[in-house]
Amino acid sequence: MDKLRLLFSVFCICVFASCGDNNDHVKETPRSVTIILSKQNSSSSYRHFIENIDPTIKINWINAYTTPLSQLTVELEDADGIILTGGVDIHPGLYGNAFDTIRCGTIDSKRDELETTLLDHALESGTPCLGVCRGLQFMNVYMGGSLHPHLPDTLSDIHRGKNGQSTEHEIYVTKALGA
């Protein structure tokens, strides 16, 4: 009888051990995501930040600015996220100051239209969207907000360092959407 219990115990242990999920020999396929940049610039900050979140993820970067609209429409359907990047000034006509372009720097109307399309898609589809610098300003304008056309007239030119180099600067959030 003891031999039978021992044999049964060994049998149960073997059965339970074989039921475990031991797939160490199976390699997982790396996950991939598609991120659309409103306009890729010479800075690698966006890529560096996202790629360091999880280096095992393969990221398919799409530069919306240079992608034909017909192809961009297809790419947007598969996009996992959108980043509205930094860049030139937003046309003041979009926030009610159409005649205030003299105080602005370079304006890119094509980009304003493109980022409107990207935000339309993000809101309709629920695709996550991150705005960085100009991108965040554009999100504000898109949602009905306004801007100061030329910050040095109001504050100081604190967002630029020597020779036009970008610098880190503080931001203050006073109200969130939906708050």
Where are each of the predicted segments found?
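Conserved G/P- and acidic residue-centered "switch" motifs that form tight phosphate/ATP-binding loops
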Residues: 133
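Bacterial N-terminal signal peptides
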Residues: 7-15
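N-terminal beta1-alpha1 cap of cysteine-dependent amidohydrolase-like domains
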Residues: 2-3, 18-130, 140-148, 152-179
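Cytosolic ligand/metal-binding cores
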Residues: 137
